Amino acid sequence: MEVGGAERVVSVLLNSWVDKYECYLILIYPNIFYKLDSRINITHLNEDSCESRAKKLLRLPLVAKKLSNVVKERNFNKVVSFLTRANYINILSSYISKHRTIISERAMPSLQYNYGLNGKINKFLIKFLYHKASLCIANSQGNKKDLEDNFAVIDLVSIPNPFDIELISELSNQYIDIEKKKFTFITIGRLDNGKNHKLIIDAIKDIDADLWIIGDGDLKGNLQNYIKELELSDKVQLLGKKENPFSFLSKADCFVFASNNEGFPNVLIEALACELPIISTDCQSGPREILAPNTNMNFQLKNNIELTLYGILTPIKDVEKLRKSMNLMIDDKKLRNNFKECSIQRANDFRVEKIIKEYEEIICID
């Protein structure tokens, strides 16, 4: 269970339920990043996280058999899975152990798997398997619509991700030893093409401000070289993966997010909980649902920026509009303060106490 949005949600759910239920966590790989209550029963299927995509695909039936053995041994009648490969394994294993399958899709498959052979294989598997699940949980309205329209998934509900707002607030007050020289933007996310950190770096090169980037990933080396190439090492810092990113959020002045596509970007809620004004691309899906909940969820910006109730939305892959939004946030203190005042109000809509009841009705009650 590495660092990531889905993994964080699993940790929140289990830690919240362990006082009421006997909780079991079955991992494909033995890695655990998030803190889990010691009372949670953890087992893993002993898979190698460094396997190639091809090997992971070929081993799906074998891993499904391993899961079915655990299910039969523990006499589980229902298994909940998070993330695409785990969903495949859950559904395939149910043919052997006959348990009910609840799968959770955390991204928009038609966009996430839109390239190459790997994308075609995953689209095929989603179309072939997902509709056979007892229930599919999407974490945004955009994801739900994508699964309905493009993958013929019928038994489907949408439940947003839960957040422990009090814990985030508490962690945000922890001391960190980092120097802040001027107006500072911050972004958090895996260093991959989808998060499009280069767009933020390109935007900030002509702005009198600093940028903190929290996260790790395959593009770390490329981004380090790109920052040096643009001679921005004095204003752009790659801070790596942080166990407590909230203390960095609380020190920054504005959160900026440049993803090309998302499922439900947890970092936007976390930034709201830290009372940060937000600039985000209007990617599918999640940012509009979070920052502009009263607008048409099917609309997507093309040529303009949009000042919403809870932040600024900009078109995807548009460096000029992103730079305009960043300059506006620096120059307009009244606008920044207005977003800050509204942020915690919006974050509270995703409180764990509220969202967990929706999960509990589906997962914990027969």
Task: Report residues per predicted region.
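Donor nucleotide-sugar binding/catalytic pocket of nucleotide-sugar-dependent glycosyltransferases
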Residues: 43, 127, 131-170
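N-terminal strand-loop element at the rim of the active site
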Residues: 1-4, 8-59, 143-150, 158
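Conserved acidic donor-binding segment of nucleotide-sugar-dependent glycosyltransferases
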Residues: 292-319, 329-333
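Aromatic "clamp/platform" in nucleotide-sugar-dependent glycosyltransferases that forms part
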Residues: 241, 260
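Nucleotide-sugar donor phosphate/pyrophosphate-binding loop at the beta->alpha transition
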Residues: 58-63, 100, 109-132
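A short, well-ordered alpha-helix in the C-terminal region of glycosyltransferases
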Residues: 328, 335-349
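Short His-centered aromatic/hydrophobic patch
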Residues: 81-87, 105
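A conserved mid-protein helix/loop that constitutes part of the nucleotide-sugar donor-binding site
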Residues: 7-12, 183, 187-206, 218-224
